Amino acid sequence: MKKKSSDFCFGSERKAQLSEFLENLSIDFNNFDLLNTALSHSSYSNELDQKADNNERLEFLGDSVLNLIITDHLYKTYPNKSEGELSKARSYIVSEDSLSSIAREIDLGSYILLGRGEESNDGRNKKGILADAIEAFVGAIYLDSGFSMATEFVVGLFDMYIRLMFNRGDFKDYKSLLQEYVQKKYKISPSYKLDKEIGPDHDKVFCVELYVGEKFISNGKGKSKKEAEMRAAEVALKAMEDINL
């Protein structure tokens, strides 16, 4: 009888990687085998000799957990929004574009186990792989620590994006759209630099500059660095067609 990957002890190097990932997110995790499975793409497990676990089942679970958490949060936080507005917000938040963008924010791609083929094809930056992995990670948190901990993680990660959407009155992820545009046209990624912070700690405004290569493109302000980056990306995207690098 063949063993599954969860029956094998992964090395200390991999455990150190997973510990680093959790430390960056300030999350405690009990079952590292479960976490490792959540970050194991099917292309990786298919290349192993033994029958190995991958994150597809956890993705299935995490998709439902994520939808419930987002739905509950929207319903309770925005009592004056209509059903149509809430549905539109939820659809955007759990879309592949949004999930992959948030996965990039937490550097999830660096910790995913990929097969050689996906590795050589830049699989760590593929939206589908990143979106599936963050759903699997949410599913793993739910199994490991329960619904309350999964809710705390998801709301903490997604709430800023939700507030930005409602404040702007649209549901576009300008950072993701800009990154796709710049990578496709110039084969590089835009970068963001914190220029300055204005005001007291309890009411701080962050000022961010956006660059493509060495060229300054735009700036943005916000109550958080992420909000400032989003606004800088929005300005850049709307002006990008007129910019010659």
UniProtKB/Swiss-Prot annotation:
Top-rank taxon, per record: Bacteria
Localization terms from the record: Cytoplasm
EC number: 3.1.26.3
Limits of the RNase III domain: 18-146
Active site feature: D63, E135
PROSITE patterns: DS_RBD (PS50137), RNASE_3_1 (PS00517), RNASE_3_2 (PS50142)
Entry binding sites for Mg(2+): E59, D132, E135
Pfam (any one): Ribonucleas_3_3
GO CC terms of this entry: cytoplasm
Gene Ontology terms: biological process: mRNA processing; regulation of gene expression; rRNA processing; tRNA processing
Swiss-Prot/TrEMBL catalytic activity: Endonucleolytic cleavage to 5'-phosphomonoester
Entry keywords, A to Z: Cytoplasm, Endonuclease, Hydrolase, Magnesium, Metal-binding, mRNA processing, Nuclease, RNA-binding, rRNA processing, rRNA-binding, tRNA processing
Family per similarity comment: Belongs to the ribonuclease III family.
Function: Digests double-stranded RNA. Involved in the processing of primary rRNA transcript to yield the immediate precursors to the large and small rRNAs (23S and 16S). Processes some mRNAs, and tRNAs when they are encoded in the rRNA operon. Processes pre-crRNA and tracrRNA of type II CRISPR loci if present in the organism.
NCBIfam families with a match to the protein in the record: RNaseIII
Assembly information from the UniProt record: Homodimer.
Descriptive protein name: Ribonuclease 3
